[in-house]
Design a protein with these regions (language model features):
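Catalytic donor/gating beta->alpha subdomain of glycosyltransferases that bind UDP-sugars
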Residues: 139, 148-171, 200-203, 208-270, ...
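Short aromatic/hydrophobic "clamp" motif used to bind/position activated sugar donors
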Residues: 118
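Membrane-embedded multi-pass helical conduit in multi-pass membrane proteins
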Residues: 271-350
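Acidic helix N-cap motif at the loop->helix transition within catalytic regions
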Residues: 47-51, 75-83, 130
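Cell-envelope/extracellular polymer assembly enzymes that use nucleotide-activated donors
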Residues: 34-37, 65, 220
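Acidic donor-binding/catalytic loop of UDP-sugar-dependent glycosyltransferases
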Residues: 76, 123-138
Length: 368
């Protein structure tokens, strides 16, 4: 019964997130004469930043400049970015208690002044040629000061393919895009993978400098924009943006441990909710393994099949292989474990290492 109820709940939330109104619509390459300055914060992204910059230079929106902010890379990131055609700026060393990525974004915003809009795009993101124009059109149509497309996770390893689509479904279950878009409701979210913001709104809330101590600077900036009365637009765009954040399982674990407690919460209630979600996913299969009588067996089978349908549907929405939905119980267990580790680090102040930097105060002001 628990598995059946969880499946119905997940199906309803997936349908809400995936319906047409939350997908990025067509854009206008002219975008009403708007111009965009693009900032790419990059730390040790050689082998990725070139593709990112090439895609940005091919945008059909009015991209006025592409500035790559090299955040102390040691692998040739700056050389690759410059060779591809970007202007390269060196980020100042972050002050104690200041997140490296937030500091790099803030520096980029200071030096990229040609556009009326700012776009912050991670170096591991590749955008389709129409991505920025469609996002800009959505923001203009809604009267929004900022927006983000929710990108497809480009995966190569089995662990990435197993975990990241299920993580996306877990995020979709928590993320109410209607509430984010409603200026009368406090819910706020933007994705730093690709974040478009009007320059005057960005400056008006203090930009990334004002949230430089936050572990999740994109969500913190979204909160400041929403509190200042600005509208936000977040749309599904799996065909317009692709990101590959993690190359190894260890990187995946560290990256999620860095963020999950900040995004989902470090309290007992959200952790218990995730544990209950995991238990509900396992419940129908454990019940079937116990060989119950026919009525209970039918309920358990229905719950299990519904869970599989939801997970396969979530993978299709995310542009991932639906066949790996059969391994969702394992994915749920791993995600619960990494979330518990993230909460532990947040509560105890355990150090976190990310991109070669160690943030000792895990319970306070960290980031990267």
């Amino acid at each position: 019964v628990a598995g059946l109820a969880a499946g119905v709940n997940s199906l309803a939330r997936l349908g809400r997130a995936g319906r047409g109104g939350h997908r990025l619509g067509p854009g206008d390459p002219g975008a009403f004469g708007e111009t965009v300055s693009v900032v790419v914060p990059a730390r040790d992204e050689a082998g990725r930043v070139g593709a990112c910059v090439a895609a940005l230079l091919a945008q059909d929106a009015a991209v006025a400049e592409v500035v790559v902010v090299d955040d102390g890379s040691a692998d040739g990131t700056a050389t690759e970015a410059a060779r591809t055609g970007a202007r390269v700026e060196a980020a100042p060393a972050p002050r104690p208690g200041v997140a490296g990525k937030a500091a790099a974004c803030a520096h980029g915003a200071r030096v990229a002044t040609a556009g009326r809009w700012l776009a912050f795009v991670d170096a591991d993101v590749v955008l389709a040629p129409e991505a920025l124009s469609r996002l800009l059109a959505a923001c203009l149509a809604a009267g929004a000061a900022a927006g983000s497309p929710l990108a497809r996770q480009a995966t190569r390893t089995w662990w990435e393919e197993l975990l990241l689509p299920d993580l996306g479904l877990a995020v979709a279950e928590r993320l109410d895009l209607d509430a984010v878009a409603d200026p009368g409701r406090p819910a706020a979210f933007l994705s730093g993978q690709c974040l478009l913001v009007r320059r005057d709104a960005y400056d008006g809330v203090g930009g990334f400098e004002a949230v430089a101590g936050s572990l999740v600077e994109d969500v913190a900036l979204a909160g400041r924009l929403k509190a200042a009365g600005h509208r936000l637009e977040v749309r599904l765009a799996p065909g317009l943006a692709a990101v590959r954040m993690y190359g190894r399982f260890g990187d995946l674990w560290e990256g999620l441990a860095k963020n999950l407690a900040e995004v989902w919460g470090a309290g007992t209630a959200p952790l218990a909710w995730q544990a209950a979600r995991t238990a509900a996913g396992w419940a129908p299969w454990l019940a079937l393994a116990a060989r119950p009588g026919p009525p209970a067996r039918r309920v358990a089978l229905a719950g299990g099949l519904l869970q599989l349908t939801v997970r396969a549907g979530g993978r299709l929405v995310a542009g991932a292989d639906p066949r790996l939905a059969v391994a969702y119980p394992l994915a749920d267990l791993v995600l619960l474990a990494v979330y518990a580790d993230s909460v532990r680090r947040r509560r105890t102040g355990a150090p976190l290492t990310w991109k070669g930097r160690t943030y000792a105060d895990a319970g306070g002001r960290r980031g990267g």
